[in-house]
Amino acid sequence: MTTAQFAVNLNMEGLKGDLLVFCVNQAKERGKIVCHNLVDAQVRAAFDLGDFSGKEGETLLLYPFHSTELSVAGAARILVLGVGDSSDQKEPGGVRDLFRRAGGCIAGQCELLKVETLMVALPETPFLDPGQTAECLVEGICLGDYRFVRYKQPESKEREYLGLKQVFLVSGKTDPAVEKGMDLGRRAALAACEARNMANEPANIWTASAFAAFAQTLAKAHSLGCRILEKSDMERLGMGGILAVNQGSGEPPKLVVLEYLPENRSETLLLVGKGVTFDSGGISLKPAPGMEKMKYDMCGGAAVLCAMQAVAEERPHVGVVAIVPATDNLSGGLAVKPGDVIRHFNGKTAEIVNTDAEGRMILADALAWGINEYNPCCVVDLATLTGAVVMGLGHHYSGIMGNNDALARCLEDAGEKAGEPLWRLPLGKAYAKQIESKVADIKNIGGKSAGAITAAAYLENFVGDTPWVHMDIAGTAWDFTEKTYIPKDGPSGIGVRTLVSLIRNWQPGTIVSSR
């Protein structure tokens, strides 16, 4: 994760660094291309020769002669980066992601060139204000600068370059919004990178107890409330779903709670994230190929806790509570079996038809308990819940389902702003019928069809009339659509920035408890 220090400079005077970046739009008509005359002349020559067009991701690397004017701001190198034509983007979210991808591309070039001190001339666009451009660019740089090398030897090639140390945004004019945008982008990106760190940890390290320890550390650093419910608490409260999934494990379960509850809060949002630290499928065992990636089954839990990192720093007017039911799902002599019946926190009974449909079982208890305990204005849950959502939406969209149109729209808007697109799927009585059980109130799978929707239908039994949206990130938590700021192999940190965007833009009274 990047440890770079960020700063905004009015101009390039006195700056020195390994790389200076100018972003160039792919426009049909051109005035001045970049702000420095000699660099502008060189770029124009490249345009005229057809060597550079400004299309997205295209690069032109210049090496200034330090005895001439081309020695811009003491830069060892100058990178001219094409960002495409922002006028081609149909939605504001598309322009935001264009500059986020530009930031990711810059980070990639910095890795190739082993850059430690980076200077970026803040690009101008009529579609975003300078603060928004700074936010997206910095977000992309931070996210693109991510690497996880904790378990590599010090002499390994992966440790030859450990990322950026200093980043200067050169704004060209005094604008407090630029510094604010830079801070917003940095905070959201660092929170997402922390979620990537959690997911990258092996399951023998990142256990339910590790979730609890992270929450306690974050709470202490930022004066948040923290509660850890132990196995004995769950037994007393009747959280049969979490306890059943944990039966085959040697690690005790935890219900991890982080609270940001300012005295002047108008409303409280509840975030719930699936925290299955390793999912073997239990008795309904998963196939061996690719099972090592099931350490990523806790990405929903990572997202809600790491979103709280940004919340703690920004201190919004709305209260936020994050809950992670944490356990692994293993087979063993005591493991829950297909055909078993359990009783959830709210008293509903469930027949376990498939032990690999465990995520909904632990989320059910967390949702019901969280609503009962905090009386939130609305609930959002995140989970790597079903393979069915991958079959339906691939790795491009996360699926959402819920009982409240206004909340769903707010979440869709937040996802668009964050570059994490969402696609709403239906819910209704026809899908609820698929999970009816002959021996219990409900069963934990609903057959081969509409698997993502029937999983949400299971969860709907535990939210009552509270406005609620479920976000299935099974297709996007890793192997997400390739972007310059998303690792090609490994966890994406999806969901964190969507939640942060939702909270930043929250308007009290928007969501009412009606459908």
UniProtKB/Swiss-Prot annotation:
GO cellular component: cytoplasm
GO terms assigned for molecular function: manganese ion binding; metalloaminopeptidase activity
Catalytic center residues: 286, 360
Positions bound to Mn(2+) 1: 279, 356, 358
GO terms for biological process, alphabetical: proteolysis
UniProt entry keywords in alphabetical sequence: Aminopeptidase, Cytoplasm, Hydrolase, Manganese, Metal-binding, Protease
EC nos: 3.4.11.1, 3.4.11.10
Cofactor(s), by name: Mn(2+)
SUPFAM superfamilies reported for this sequence: Macro domain-like, Zn-dependent exopeptidases
Keyword Hydrolase: yes
Family per record: Belongs to the peptidase M17 family.
PANTHER family (alphabetical): CYTOSOL AMINOPEPTIDASE, LEUCINE AMINOPEPTIDASE-RELATED
Task of the protein: Presumably involved in the processing and regular turnover of intracellular proteins. Catalyzes the removal of unsubstituted N-terminal amino acids from various peptides.
Name of this chain's protein: Probable cytosol aminopeptidase
Species, as recorded: Desulforapulum autotrophicum (strain ATCC 43914 / DSM 3382 / VKM B-1955 / HRM2)
This protein's encoding gene: pepA
